[in-house]
Amino acid sequence: MQSFHFGGTEIPPGTGVELSLELGDGPAGNPRSIPVYVLHGSKPGPVLGLVAGIHGDELNGVSVVHHLIHGDDHIANTEDDTINREQLSGTLICVPVVNIEGMLLEQRGAPDNRDINRLFPGKQSGNQSQRIAHALFEGVVSRADYLIDLHSAPHSRTNLPHVRADFDKKECLELARAFGTQIILHSSGPKGSLRREASTKGTPTILLEAGTAHRFEMEAVHSGIEGVLNVMAHLGMIERKSRQPGFRLLVRRSKWARAEAGGLLYSLVKPGDHVKKGQNIALITDPLGAKTHTIQSPRTGVIVGLTLNPLVRAGDPIANIVLCSENKWMQAQVEPDTEVPEEESVDDEESVDDA
């Protein structure tokens, strides 16, 4: 087994090394960089890239990467490490926080207020965010055979753990199935997003959405850990029996339910609930608590995203619903893989993607 070379550093088989992607100096002359941890196995195998924190306020993915590097005790090179480097086949490139400065500012975007996940593959001589995107794309994506991008819902929303992938790319769909969430949503991603540009360049990429921003939610974190390990087992990188959900629903479209009036919101549903078209999913009150409006589901399907903010204005997104008939929902409970046909999920002109 040969050593793995990353940014001029030689990494011997069976070792883990802390590295970085350099970004140039900050305002005070301080060096700026993206932290990277490379686990290089003792056996040959694929290179899997694991990326989190492209949006600085989305922290669940950061914790997923931490646990995969160091185990539950967060101490390197101990017996409880999640991944045994001596038994690892291939290489895992871990990037726990891409947008370091955004994280320190507790905001989604970079310090220049641009969304890094609309700027891939980036530009070496571009603005701050383009340079971050370029460093990640050239340093990690170009080295990876496969990629997993970890996200949470934006501020004041939450997402049921689910994977988004381009169903029209066979390897992406296979990775999504292997990850093992109950819901898999077809989405190639917006132009400039990491998963779209990486997949286009030949690195099959999937995205996990789990939980909300600004916190570590251990249920969401554990779903991410299990999913990454499932993918590694699928790729032959580790020996492990995959832990799959009781059902898996493959859906091609989703639709937002939006508030038609402002006020104080009371949700009547939670992520994972199956709702029927016309079902009451939330109500809006005036400042004294009197009901003024009811929000109904625009389609039949499963709630995968929900606002957490009780203060709403007309047009605000309330619930993201993946489109699925009641028959398909019942079928999914007894069949391992159920795919909702395209004809059940047409007419949605809105983008699913916050990531």
Each model region followed by its residue ranges:
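Structured catalytic-domain cores with a bias toward divalent-metal coordination
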Residues: 1-355
